[in-house]
Amino acid sequence: MTGRSYEVRTFGCQMNVHDSERLSGLLESAGYVPAPPGSEADVVVFNTCAVRENADNRLYGNLGQLVPVKKGHPGMQIAVGGCLAQKDRSTILDRAPWVDVVFGTHNLHRLPVLLERARHNAAAELEIAEALEVFPSSLPTRRASHHSAWVSISVGCDNTCTFCIVPSLRGRERDRRPGDVLAEVEALVGEGALEITLLGQNVNSYGRSLGDPGAFAKLLLACGRVDGLERVRFTSPHPRDFTDDVIEAMAATPNVCHQLHMPLQSGSDDVLRRMRRSYRRDRFLGIVERVRAAMPDAAITTDIIVGFPGETEADFADTLDVVRQARFAGAFTFQYSPRPGTPAATMDGQIDRTTVAERYARLVALQDEVSWAQNRELVGRRVELLVAEGEGRKDDATGRLSGRARDGRLVHFRAGAGLAARPGDVVETVVTRAAPHHLTADGPLLSHRRTRAGDAWELARTAPVPAAGDGAGTTAARQTVALGMPSVGPAPSPGRR
């Protein structure tokens, strides 16, 4: 059956966002079309997270809201995949028997088949693979952005952090070969992408399974030789594996952005030991110091967990001290919550929620102070922005557009006269005001470069929305799908789109 509409709802990390692009690509390659905004999709797919607090409550709350919708929508199907599906398996069908398909992290490619089988048999399909069956980068992908793209360099994780369930759900780390990664990068740039983010659970352990511990630095240098690629980012590195050759490659490669997201998790050596993080605060601060020595303008962000079991007030004070010393541009901060199946969930010294919330508030207040101080130093500075879509929640009300500076900071700016800047275009402007989490530029644009990515965004916006069951619409929708990673041959030229 083709021509049915679909919607993918994503919870969790960048890995899930990229996996959802693949799920969309698989569905469109099988003949499904994106559901128009505001409509009820024939197929709703949940790509779930098992790391965030209350991840299961969020899923089952959303599933519960679909019960009356499904009753009034004959033939509607609901699928649940991702990390929570890999973990909970049949529990999902026990708690939500109206779900039609449950699939895991290792068998994304099976979704269209499972949906059709469930429809044909009028019975739920549960299929969880224990190991990766098909490397995800070979799957069709419907990119969410014309100008910026994720490129996976590895899947899985070999670390054993006591708070994290990801390795048991994503499997052991497996690296793609550098030539395959670069082929995908070149193909994306050939299609108009300006920015690539290299993605992995631990990007700077890349190459270990290939017998080349310096492979990640070499990959950054190779990305610097890709014509037309303007920005390269990566996420996330592990401080244990962060080596000086990566810093040297970042500093020496013009299109590698001076931005580093490196998870701290805690500033206390005792807590880091219980977390099994394999580094200590002095090593972390040493990396920060060397990065800033090589790239004084680098924006460094981090992840921090508050209230890990056994964390004392002195441990928490150590974390605040590292925040002051490291001067993070921003931080993703989390209140620890026990995740079933992790060693930390059964550790002694679980901290009461009131104490955790109080420490969390102090951490956020300090980080906002640090971020705001850094951002105020940028007022009056000229910045180059890659115009984004959906980054500014108040853009419509304020008459502004939003974009990302090369260091990753979010900047809201005035659109200016003449041809409007579009997502994917590149503009230059001057920062006029600072806030803890963004910058504002209310002056005139100093330059505006229209790009092929902006052209593609404009074309997609003006194209008619395909209707479910409309064969022509289905074909139009499928033109946005890249059919996997090219194995050989050059990237397509701009004229061969």
Curated annotation (Swiss-Prot):
UniProt entry keywords in alphabetical sequence: 4Fe-4S, Cytoplasm, Iron, Iron-sulfur, Metal-binding, S-adenosyl-L-methionine, Transferase, tRNA processing
Query: How many cofactors are bound and how?
Result: Binds 2 [4Fe-4S] clusters. One cluster is coordinated with 3 cysteines and an exchangeable S-adenosyl-L-methionine.
- UniProt cross-references to CDD domains, sorted A to Z: Radical_SAM (cd01335)
Q: Which residues form the Radical SAM core domain?
A: 143-374
The primary location reported for this protein is cytoplasm
Q: Where does [4Fe-4S] cluster 2 bind?
A: C157, C161, C164
Q: What is its EC number?
A: 2.8.4.3
Q: What protein family is recorded?
A: Belongs to the methylthiotransferase family. MiaB subfamily.
Q: What is this protein called?
A: tRNA-2-methylthio-N(6)-dimethylallyladenosine synthase
Species for this entry: Frankia alni (strain DSM 45986 / CECT 9034 / ACN14a)
Gene field = miaB
